[in-house]
A protein has these predicted regions:
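Conserved CoA-thioester-binding segment of acyl-CoA-metabolizing enzymes
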Residues: 2-62, 99
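Glycine- (often His-adjacent) and acidic-residue-rich active-site loop
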Residues: 63-97, 116
Length: 261
């Protein structure tokens, strides 16, 4: 007898698929692809694995499902943080993903099919070339819960500039359209649907997989010039976030958000 799927929730995962020189890293979490520490760790490890694999020439970073790209930090884990050390460790997960992408010798193509919040915007910014659909609105919501986009900030600012980054940060409850994000440089292209987007992603990935790896590595190094201090900078930002997340303001704001959503 076929079992009912009512109430069934897929389990979280991070998986990597390798095919014809292209590594596709896909992550999923049933809560709108939110990012608990173990997912962040696995994404960083997967990027490193693809980087070390000589058969891989280009990487695609995507999330599962067809609605949200990434809801950012897991609120459940934020609420469970008891001290500064735990806070620093959690936020270091975002630093590790961004730094893994930054130091990866291979181009990373981002695939953003839906809304991106906080760390999801940071992850998109850490890719080298990002595709999106028209449903991929973005928001940096950190200030609304009493912290700030400290860890992802350098990656976002590098991609869209200080003015647009300031606009996103200070309007922490506002969604900005995919078209706005394209105009600011976060997204290279915005498509009507995932079918059109995936066709173009595959075309670019195949072209890059047949390009000179040495030339691509040199180009990537040039593109990321000026970020050599990010190992230290992002960990410093993680410490700052780890302190702020312990405040009563943040605890109350997260509780209020969870009750209303």
């Amino acid at each position: 007898m076929q079992q009912s799927l009512k109430g069934y929730k897929m389990k979280e995962y991070v998986k990597i698929d390798k095919n014809e020189g292209i590594a596709t890293i896909e992550f999923f979490h049933p809560q709108s692809n939110s990012l608990p520490a173990n997912i962040l760790h696995k994404i960083a490890i997967s990027i490193n694995e693809a980087d070390y694999d000589e058969d891989i020439k280009v990487i695609i970073l995507k999330s599962g499902g067809d609605r949200a790209f990434c809801a950012g930090a897991s609120f459940d884990e934020l609420m469970s943080i008891k001290n500064e050390k735990e806070g620093e460790k959690f936020f270091s997960g975002f630093a590790n993903v961004i730094n893994a992408a930054r130091k990866c010798s291979k181009f990373i193509i981002g695939r953003v099919q839906g809304k991106a919040v906080g760390g999801g915007v940071g992850m998109s910014s850490a890719t080298d070339y990002c595709f999106a659909t028209k449903y991929a609105s973005i928001k940096l919501s950190e200030l609304a819960i009493g912290i700030g986009p400290f860890v992802v900030g350098p990656a976002v600012e590098r991609k869209i500039g200080l003015s647009a980054y300031s606009t996103l940060t200070m309007n922490a409850t506002e969604w900005f359209s995919a078209q706005w994000a394209r105009e600011k440089g976060l997204f290279s292209h915005v498509y009507e649907n995932t079918t059109e987007m995936d066709k173009k992603i595959n075309e670019l990935a195949k072209n890059l997989a047949n390009s000179n790896p040495e030339s691509m590595q040199k180009l990537k190094n040039i593109m990321w010039e000026g970020t050599e201090n990010w190992d230290e900078l992002l960990l410093q930002r993680a410490r700052e976030s780890g302190k702020l997340v312990l405040s009563n303001f943040t605890k109350n704001a997260i509780n209020s958000f969870k009750k209303n959503n």
